[in-house]
């Protein structure tokens, strides 16, 4: 056995500094796994939260398309979970803020009428509780919002009270470019604002209930 073989054999299993540097360089060049998209703690491109309010991001981006060119009608729901004892539901104010990106800039309008045929607000709860004070607002800065007040239950005390609220909104198309494909909407962010309330549990994740495409579905 030559002296070079003995020398190499004597260092078997012990990495050299050169091999360590090479391994580190090779590891750095390996493709990294995709980063997880975690919702941020406060709105980024929406309006800023007001004092005394809690903002929460609900869900991931959602894309909707119109198949008949009449518009898109869709329904969102979220669960309000109160876990603390002796919590009053009255005077809770919710605001849903949608940040949207249309497929064709300037080709959509927000309907002024978001009520049913008999004049009731389309925001309702379970079991089908009405929100007569619901107000719909369009804002060019971030999209549109629906503001409503939860119904007052005359001093009712909720213990482990769980309530699911659904909000139905309607978008109509306006001045769609000739020859364009079916327009679509991408909802970048959905935020819910509620008044800070003692011992109130967090709002659960956003649930997509359904997509309505017929004009008389709502």
Curated annotation (Swiss-Prot):
Q: Where in the cell is it found?
A: Virion
A Pfam entry, by short name: Ilar_coat
Region (Disordered), start-end ranges: 1-25
- Tell me, what is one Gene Ontology molecular-function annotation carried by this entry? RNA binding
| Modified sites of kind N-acetylserine | 2
Mind listing the UniProt keywords for this protein, alphabetically? Acetylation, Capsid protein, Ribonucleoprotein, RNA-binding, T=3 icosahedral capsid protein, Viral nucleoprotein, Virion
**Mostly located where?**
virion
InterPro entries given for it? Coat_Ilarvirus (IPR002681)
Q: Which family does it belong to?
A: Belongs to the alphamovirus/ilarvirus capsid protein family.
Name the record gives this protein: Capsid protein
């Amino acid at each position: 056995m030559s002296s070079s073989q003995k020398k190499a054999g004597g260092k078997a299993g012990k990495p050299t500094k050169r091999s360590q540097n090479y391994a580190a360089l090779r590891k750095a060049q390996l493709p990294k796994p995709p980063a997880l998209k975690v919702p941020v703690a406060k709105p980024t491109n929406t309006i800023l939260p007001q004092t005394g309010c809690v903002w929460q991001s609900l869900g991931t981006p959602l894309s909707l398309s119109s198949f008949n060119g009449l518009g898109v009608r869709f329904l969102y729901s979220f669960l309000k979970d109160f876990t603390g004892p002796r919590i009053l539901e009255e005077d809770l104010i919710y605001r849903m803020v949608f940040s949207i990106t249309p497929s064709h800039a300037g080709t959509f309008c927000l309907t002024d009428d978001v009520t049913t045929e008999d004049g009731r607000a389309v925001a309702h709860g379970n079991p089908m509780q009405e929100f007569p004070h619901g107000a719909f607002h369009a804002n060019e800065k971030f999209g549109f919002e629906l503001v409503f007040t939860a119904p007052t239950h005359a001093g009712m005390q909720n213990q482990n009270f769980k309530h699911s609220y659904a909000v139905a909104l309607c978008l109509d198309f306006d001045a769609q470019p000739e020859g364009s494909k079916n327009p679509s909407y991408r909802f970048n962010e959905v935020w819910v604002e509620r008044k800070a309330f003692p011992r109130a549990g967090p709002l659960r994740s956003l649930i997509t209930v359904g997509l309505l495409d017929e004009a008389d579905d709502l």
